[in-house]
Amino acid sequence: MSYPQGYLYQPSASLALYSCPAYSTTVISGPRTDELGRSPSGSAFSPYAGSTAFTASSAGFNSPLQYSGDPAAAFTSYVGSPYDHSAGMAGSLGYHPYAAPLGTYPYGDPAYRKNATRDATATLKAWLNEHRKNPYPTKGEKIMLAIITKMTLTQVSTWFANARRRLKKENKMTWTPRNRSEDEEDDENIDLEKNEEDDPRKLEEKGDQDGDAGDQKRSPSAVDFDRLEGEVRQGKELDQTRSDSEQNEVEERNDLLSKNSAPPTSPLCPPDQSPQAQEDQNLHRHTVHNHHHQSIQQLHHHSHQSHPLDLVHRNALVQHGPVTNNATSVIHSPPASTSKPKLWSLAEIATSSDKVKESSDAAAVAGTTPAQSMVVSASSPSRSPSAQCHFPSNTVLSRPLYYSNPFYPGYTNYGTFSHLHSHHGPSTTSPTVNSTHHFSGINQTVLNRAEALAKECKLRSQSQADLNKDTPYEMKKGMSSI
């Protein structure tokens, strides 16, 4: 790299092992021709030993330097240490090679001073005294002060941060502290944080201000969050109680299954209890739950008025005429099987053919006369246990008790599944339309226990109790009307 005329290239000792000797300005400002010797690197003043720049005289190069004609002398004086000057170079040394710099800032030194001068400090102090009420210079003011004081922007910001910290320590603070602004540098922020930690009084004042601001800034979103949190907590408590009730219900179902598997006749439908006593007990239950019936019928009126199974039920009653209990006994069995969920067990599928066969037998027996059907259902508990226990299917507990109709709306959010939950209001077709289903003994017992275990589901248990009106009383009413 070649340098322009008038500029003296002065390499430092850290860059070149053998530095170039200093030349006077007359050497550089003298006439130059293309015959000036150059090194292969293209530098006019090459520091390498093999250069022939000044070892021979060139035509037209009038050098005032007193070089001897001996190349060896020129070589030693050119390559030698700059501190060991030869006699031939003594006249050309106008200044020491490592003397004062030519420019404002020396080569290799940092562009700015590390410490501020007195003039710069005085300028910054004057600005600080003028702005004692707000000693936070803006970005533009910092740039202006940096230009005036010949300091960097970071140095100016740090100086003001330190000045504010000193004033705080000396209790000469005449401004209100503010939060860290965006235009302040990181070191200034660190200094401010240290300052707040150093001054305990300011910490107390800041704590009071933060407390007041926290009360004032309590936004509606925080209030909504607290409210939602409370609702979630209540929901968890309800889920806990529901899980407990479901666990107790499963235990009850297991107990009932274990009791029913031992004897052929169900202990829930004791054989020693006469049909007349059962009818009296059912009449009492019907009277107790009559007021529940009125409210539930209004709720179920709209959803079940056009239920297809309900329409089938009514049409069958109209067609059969006087044989009303035959229609009800035949119709109640198939919809109970269709109202199941999709989760059927293998045992249930295997016994489905037996169910159909027994249901046809029961229909044939009940189809003789209404009086004979009453006698058969009362006198043969061993042949058809479901006739006494009033189950929708002909096998005792052929499916899990949890999936029976009164349990599903009571303990889940699902609606009704069949005409068993249909509208039970007065009908002009026949009095037996008010009959619901054959759930008499077992469901009433289990529901009474479930009501004691799950009191929070009071409304649901009332709807379950309404569904437990039994058909013997309704059948008696139908026969009396005949």
UniProtKB/Swiss-Prot annotation:
DNA-binding region listed in the record: 109-171
Keyword Transcription on entry: yes
InterPro entries: HD (IPR001356), Homeobox_CS (IPR017970), Homeodomain-like_sf (IPR009057), Iroquois_homeo (IPR003893), KN_HD (IPR008422)
Biased composition (Acidic residues): 182-198
UniProt superkingdom: Eukaryota
Alphabetical list of PROSITE patterns matching this protein: HOMEOBOX_1, HOMEOBOX_2
Biased composition (Basic and acidic residues): 199-256, 467-482
Molecular-function annotations in GO: DNA binding; DNA-binding transcription factor activity, RNA polymerase II-specific
GO biological process: brain development; cell differentiation; dorsal/ventral pattern formation; embryonic cranial skeleton morphogenesis; gonad development; proximal/distal pattern formation
Record flagged with keyword DNA-binding: yes
Positions with biased composition (Basic residues): 284-305
Tissues in which the UniProt entry reports expression: Expressed in the neural plate in overlapping patterns with other irx members, which all share an anterior border of expression. Broadly expressed in the tailbud rhombencephalon (hindbrain). Outside the nervous system and at tailbud stages, expressed in the developing otic vesicle and branchial arches.
GO cellular component entries: cytoplasm; nucleus
UniProt biased composition (Pro residues): 264-273
Alphabetized Gene3D superfamilies for the sequence: Homeodomain-like
Subcellular location as annotated: Nucleus
Region (Disordered): 173-307, 462-482
Keywords: Developmental protein, Differentiation, DNA-binding, Homeobox, Neurogenesis, Nucleus, Transcription, Transcription regulation
Family to which the UniProt record says this protein belongs: Belongs to the TALE/IRO homeobox family.
Known role: Acts partially redundantly with other irx members in neural patterning. Required for formation of the posterior forebrain, midbrain, hindbrain, and to a lesser extent, spinal cord. Patterns the neuroectoderm in both the anterior/posterior and dorsal/ventral axes. Does not appear to play a role in pronephros kidney development. Involved in craniofacial and gonadal development. Modulates the migration of progenitor cell populations in branchial arches and gonads by repressing CXCL12.
Protein name (database record): Iroquois-class homeodomain protein irx-5
UniProt organism field: Xenopus tropicalis (Western clawed frog)
Taxonomic classification: Eukaryota, Metazoa, Chordata, Craniata, Vertebrata
Gene name per UniProt: irx5
